[in-house]
Amino acid sequence: MAVETVVATPEDNDPWINAQRQFDAAADVLHLEPGIRAILREPQRELSVNFPVRMDDGSVEVFRGYRVQHNVNRGPAKGGIRFHPQVTLNEVRALSMWMTWKCAVAGIPFGGAKGGVIVDPGRLSHDELERLTRRYATEISLLIGADRDIPAPDVNTTPEVMAWIMDTVSMSEGYSIPAVVTGKPLSVGGSEGRNAATGRGCAMVAHQVCARLGLDPRRLTAAVQGFGNVGSIAARLMARDGFSIRAVSDAYGGIHSEVALDIPAVVEHTRRTGSVVGFPGARPVTNAELLELPVDVLVPAALENQITAANAGRVQATLVLEGANGPTTPDAEEILVRRGVTVVPDIVTNAGGVIVSYFEWVQDLQSFFWSEREINERLGRILTRAFDASWEASERLGVSLRLGAYAVAVQRVAEATSDRGIFP
C-alpha cells in the first residue's frame, strides 16, 4: 500500500468544522432543501456555565462546563457528559451533532446532545468530584430531564457519576427520576449490559463488516487504541471471536506483540497497575505508533482527531473501526478511502452505547426490566439494521460507508424536521 504524506491544517483538527464538513457532504448527496440544511447545520441550544466548587482544603475553584443540544426533532436529546481538561465548546458541538446522526441511523427516537466540563478528574478527590458533578448537574438542570435531554457516561464519567446526577435532579424535584440519565448502577435503575454495550457493539460491527467483505476474523490481526471501557471490552470480545489482538494502548502508552496478546491478562495487568504499559512479553509503543502498525484491523477507541491528514498515509490497516467519536478527520478519510481502506464510521461502530441507553430509558419509564440476554439480542438486531442500511446506501449512492450512514441518518432527521414544520 502506497504511503502518502500530507501536512495537517489547524482546521483539520477542529471537531466542529469536521462535523459540519461531514454533514455538508451528506446534504450535497441528498440535495437537501436549503432551509432544512440551515436548520440541521447548527446546534439548536447551547448552554455555557461557570460554577464554583469548594475543594477539600476549603478553597474555591471555578470550573467551566457546557451542554449543547443539536437537534430534538426526532425525540428528546441524548448524549454523554465528559470530564476532561481539553473539553472545548466546539468539541461539544461536534459530539452533539454526531449523536443526532447516531440515534437516527440506529432508528431510536432521540435527538443529539453532549456535555462536558473542563477538568482533570484525576487531580480531584472523590468528594471533590462528587461536589463538582452535583453542581454541574444543577447548572444544566435548565435543559436536562427524562422527557427533554438524557445524559449518559462518556470520557472520565462513570455509573457512579450518573447516580450523583440522578440523585441531584431527583432531590430538586422531590421524587426519584431514574430516567433522567442512563448508564447508572443497576441498584438505581441501570440496565443489564449497558456498561459493556459500546465495546460489545463494536465487536458486533466487526463481524458484520467482515461478513460483507468476505473476511475470516480468525485470519485477521488487530490493534486497539484506547483501553478504557470501550476499547478493553471490544478487544476482549474480538479476541474471543478469533481476531488476533496484537497491540493496545491507553493514555500512558501502548504495547505491541508479534503474537496475539492475552487480553484478559492485559485487563488484569491494567487493573493492578493502572495502565497497559509494562505488560510482560510485549514491547512498548506510543499511541501514534500504534496507529501505523502492520495489522489488518485498526480500532481507534480513544479520543477524536487521532487519524489525520498527517498520518493517514502511514496507516497500514485495511479496515478501520471507529470505536471513538470522530477519531478520523475528513481529510484523513479521503486519503484512506483513496488507498482502499474501509472505514466503518463512529455513528455505526460505537452506537451500542446509546442503543442500550435507549433500552435503559424505556425500562426506567416502564419500571420493567429485561435480562442481559434480551438486551444483547435487541442490541444485535438494531445494530445489524443500522449497519445494513448504511452499507446498502453506500452501494446505492456510490459513496463511502460513512457517507452512506450519514445519508441514512440525515434523511431521517430531515424528514422529521419537514413533517413537524416551522413554528409558529
PLM regions with names:
Residues 253-343, 348:
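Rossmann-like adenosine-cofactor binding region
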Residues 49-121:
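Glycine-rich, N-terminal phosphate-binding loop and its surrounding beta-alpha-beta segment
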Residues 7-14, 209-210, 314-424:
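Adenosine-phosphate binding glycine-rich loop
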Residues 185, 190-292:
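Glycine-rich phosphate/diphosphate-binding loop of Rossmann-like nucleotide-binding domains
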Residues 33-39, 107, 144-153, 175-179, ...:
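Flexible, glycine/charged-enriched surface loops at secondary-structure junctions
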Residues 84, 104-218:
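Glycine/serine-rich phosphate-binding loop and adjoining beta1-alpha1 elements at the start
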Residues 6-50:
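Short, Gly/Pro- and small/polar-rich lid/capping loops
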